[in-house]
């Protein structure tokens, strides 16, 4: 994979959550990499009530800012490096599975080629992973 620096965030979050939630009931963590659409069969087979996508998305905010979005608040042109735009993936998932699809996005500093997360995005990683793990472990989530 030819990763672009901050675009590694989604995979890094998925890896952290897999470590933090190895046996959490009702939770599956899938690392979609640069083609999350390839995991739609796995997601459909699990039949979740919610799908949470984790990604670095240029949404015009301060780098490192975390935001929640649903399909209606994501523009087709919002910059990501995935083969299928996130809006279309979100629409497909919510149309093929009776579930709520949510994006937890982080504003990247850069999506240029690189091997490391930028400082503001890296600073967000551990606290966001901890918050998500705690939320997903909570009863009545």
Question: Residue ranges of each PLM-predicted region?
Answer:
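N-terminal catalytic or cofactor-binding beta/alpha core of small enzyme domains
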Residues: 1-108, 115-139
């Amino acid at each position: 994979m030819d990763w672009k620096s901050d675009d590694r965030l989604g995979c890094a979050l998925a890896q952290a959550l897999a470590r933090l939630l190895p046996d959490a009931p009702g939770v599956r963590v899938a690392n979609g990499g640069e083609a999350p659409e390839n995991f739609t069969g796995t997601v459909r087979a699990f039949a979740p009530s919610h799908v949470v996508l984790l990604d670095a998305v240029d949404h015009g905010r301060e780098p490192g800012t975390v935001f929640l979005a649903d399909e209606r608040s994501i523009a087709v042109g919002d910059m990501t490096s995935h083969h299928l735009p996130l809006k279309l993936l979100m629409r497909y998932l919510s149309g093929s599975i009776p579930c709520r699809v949510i994006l937890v996005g982080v504003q990247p500093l850069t999506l240029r080629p690189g091997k490391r997360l930028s400082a503001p995005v890296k600073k967000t990683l551990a606290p966001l992973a901890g918050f998500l793990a705690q939320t997903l472990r909570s009863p009545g989530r």
